[in-house]
Amino acid sequence: MSLRFVIGRAGSGKSTLCLHEVQEELKQRPRGETILYLVPEQMTFQTQQALIGSEDVRGSIRAQVFSFSRLAWKVLQEVGGASRLHIDEAGVHMLLRKIVESRKDGLSVFQKAAEQNGFFEHLGSMIAEFKRYNVTPSNVYEMWQQLDAHSSSAEQKLLANKVYDLQLLYDDFERALIGKYLDSEDYLQLLVEKLPQSEYVKGAEVYIDGFHSFSPQELEIVRQLMICGARVTITLTIDEKTLAQPVNELDLFYETTLTYEKIKQVAREEKIEIEKTIPLMEQPRFHSPALAHLEMHYEARPNEKFHGEASVTIHTAANLRAEVEGVAREIRRLVAEENYRYRDIAVLLRNGESYYDVMRTLFTDYNIPHFIDEKRPMSHHPLVECIRSALEIISGNWRYDAVFRCVKTELLYPLDVRKETMREEMDEFENYCLAYGVQGKRWTSEDPWMYRRYRSLDDTNGMITDSEREMEEKINRLRDVVRTPVIRMQKRLKRAGTVMQMCEAVYLFLEELDVPKKLEALRIRAEESGDFLFATDHEQVWEEVMSLLDTFVEMLGEEKMSLSMFTDVMSTGLEALQFANIPPSLDQVLIANIDRSRLSNVKATFVIGVNEGVIPAAPMDEGMLSDEERDVLSAAGIELAPTTRQTLLEEQFVMYQMVTRATEKLYISCPLADEEGKTLLASSFIKKIKRMFPDVIDTFITNDVNDLSRSEQISYVATPEVTLSYVMQQLQTWKRYGFEGNLDFWWDVYNFYVTSDEWKQKSSRVLSSLFYRNRAQKLSTAVSRDLYGDKIKGSVSRMELFNRCAYAHFAQHGLSLRERDIFKLDAPDIGELFHAALKRIADRLLRENRTWADLSIKECEHLSAVVIEEIAPLLQRQILLSSNRHFYLKQKLQQIIFRTSIILREHAKSSGFVPVDLEVPFGMGGTGSLPPMEFSLPNGVKMEVVGRIDRVDKAEDENGTFLRIIDYKSSSKALDLTEVYYGLALQMLTYLDVVTSNAHTWMKKGGTASPAGVLYFHIHNPIVEVKGDASEAEIEKEILKKFKMKGLVLGDADVVRLMDNKLSTGSSDIISAGLKKDGSFSARSSIASEQEFNVLQKYVHHTFENIGKDITEGVIDIAPYKKGNKAACTFCNFKSVCQFDESLEDNQFRTLKDMKDSEAMEKIREEVGGE
């Protein structure tokens, strides 16, 4: 029994010496005593290859490469102890979830924290850390007693409570495992106990290579190996000079020196002979003087400089993508020009979550075979999502999001139906569910679902059409596809008495969906497309899910569990599932994390993402215990994993290892921006390397080849996939700026694409963007007639839409596009309710021959309640009756109608104008409809402007009959003559023209009528500010002012007084007008003369004619208006269709000048030739 150390700096040949000794021993005595070669888990594959890579050693039974966990398996299989069921990380998280749920009421700190994402991962890591450091539940309990007895501050009490919670959960966890299960850490503890009984290990020659430190648990294994084995050889990365000096925590080899001393202490305790240490002083790894210099002088202060040509390269990249592309280009150059193999190259990084997806895509495009050494979660695989969302459907009462997350896994689709067909149908089905607000009991009810196209309050009694019936049948068929398997599982879960039966329900759910066959089809499809990584994913995920169900049953099978807890525990287990890494092929670039990698035989290393806060790492206080709390526990005698401060001290050693892996070339790079364009800073580590190699030039990597010389651009010609974008850059620059000279070799590259059979079609689609102009071509006469017909019938809103943006009009009325219908109460729905409610009250008053002035306050309240109750079941598929929230909203809407009724009552008392009709149709056909506004366009097309007028009021005096238009609005609005001029506000003047033009046929007494004005009535329930001692009358007066109607009224004092008979002088509380003492109008009055009203009406006709002409002649310009802070695009539903982009040459707003009303009126006169 002896111990031997082999020490030396990085690259000194420690592993080579050990492997050579083993190989020589195998050549001399192939059947001798066991040789154990222990390495970290991530080194086992490459070490096994190196061991049998010698020509003289093609295989061996005597020598085996192990990690600690693999050695545990080997020993336990030999001496017993492996009969207990192994639970993996997912099983641990599930068990912890169950323990926490059952203990929740007794927890102090973790009761709420348990609901946070990642809690069980942190808790599992904490318990694993306890085990690795030989901390038992009783140790934690004793620590809690000590802390509880001496805690006075809030921080101390928090730590005491946290330790108490940890002790409870750790103890429950250990009790659940006793005699039944083993987790990963338990194997190492069992290994310590069983090693003395192992004949396989007894007398073995043991090599321990590649470790820098050992946990207390691992140190105990080393102790037993020294006791049981013949000799233990341990390699450590230490400079021999360090051992002759006092240990300093700032020393580069501080961690490995401590490990050296700990192992020697163990050997002394066990009276193990300590052989003479073998120090290795040479640097056989490095074939480059520069890399040898970097290793030898890495920690020197001040930095030792290396002059001359160096094999160290520093790059700064414009962004992360440019950085990765630069790496890819250099890898291809090394392989093509310097005879490198891909396996000779490694890429090291730390923030893999930012890089892996980009690297996977770009390395594939550059045809670089690669292996990413990462653990990928299974949480996004369709199978995992299907199980999780199906359980959420059941436990969450069939919420929309859970249902369609399950649908979109496509595992609910019947096996014999084309996926493409099902996707289209399910999209339609989802639209239906969104429009009808389907959730909850509607999914489980046997009542068939109905489909009707109507949404209007006036269109509720239509007969079902054939197309509606066909759609209804499809919807019910798709409903059964979705709900049937889930309902079957739901029933089984409710009947289940134990966890075993609940797991069986999940298994049967998957089997009845033919999931294994569907996954096999996905695997075959992935293989056919050459994506072998994802092909194996589909195999792995089924095996892992089945293993998870088995583990669940083994651990908790006979227990009873609520459905919600079962869902939570299952979800916790599913979140922990990870894809196993498939060993790399013989010739791939290895992409690995700096902290986990243990590289060997690498000629070139690319260290990427060397940004501040990443390399070296910024301090991060994460996990269950903070650094301060760990320090408290450490002071009390509980040793745990290093604190953030200790980890930061070890960063220098990590970076030293990072830059000493390669034998020939080292590349260091950093991006200046991330994928979102946020600025990143270069690491101070790059400055250190620059000081060591002052002759090395920091080169800049860009995505834009136009920034490079022609000689530099040639390196950007790589594979057809990636080069196409650079050809585009060159051609765009040439086209836009017409630079002097020619495109040199880029024309040759261009010719390759346009002549290649494989790339001709692909490249033409991309290259066509060179000539892309986001312009909508004018429709031909034939197309225009097909879309709009020979007779156009449109509302005023449609005409206004055309003037806002011709393309938006084309999208809505030509292509008939519309937004997805969502089951929610929008502004148009509320507006429709307000109109309907006020019309019903007014109709009732007309039938009773009463006016608004006749109503009492109580009647206003009663009528508002009655009409809202009548309308609620008719509005938007009964949305106001669908939930408590909407019921509350219904009450608020009733209050608004009540308040509006009171105001209309006050207006009626103060006005000579009375409503003569509401919701007056024109051009709609049928009894009571006024004629449309008709136009014969120059191209022969007939156009009718139609609509419905909210309210028409009439007043009479000795001067004749006057008519005014009242338009109800759910937001404040005024008539802007500038908008009238630009054709953006034509509605009110159109309505006024229709009623006055048709007065002789419309009014019961016949005759003519003059325009009195157009006014907007804002329906709302305002809040007013008043003094604390204000009376109720004063408050009501202030509220009345908030309802002042804005618009444009006839500039006739008598007519204005008809509108407000309380007005003598001053401003009216009812309309936007006021009178001075001399009888003239105040400056702020919104008035127009009768002649001006006539001019405005002529202008409306003129504008409609122009609009009609443009529509029928196919004008669909993408030319939205912009006026001040208003723009057509702000609330447009078609932005994703037109792709309007101000950065494009052809896409600019039509900027409309804001004008005073007088200026706008003058321009209107000019247009129509008015006086």
Curated annotation (Swiss-Prot):
Q: What is its EC number?
A: 3.1.-.-
Where on this chain does [4Fe-4S] cluster bind?
Answer: C805, C1129, C1132, C1138
Keyword Iron-sulfur assigned to the entry: answer is yes
EC main group? hydrolase
ATP-binding keyword on record? yes
Q: Residues in domain UvrD-like helicase C-terminal?
A: 281-587
**Protein name, UniProt field:** ATP-dependent helicase/deoxyribonuclease subunit B
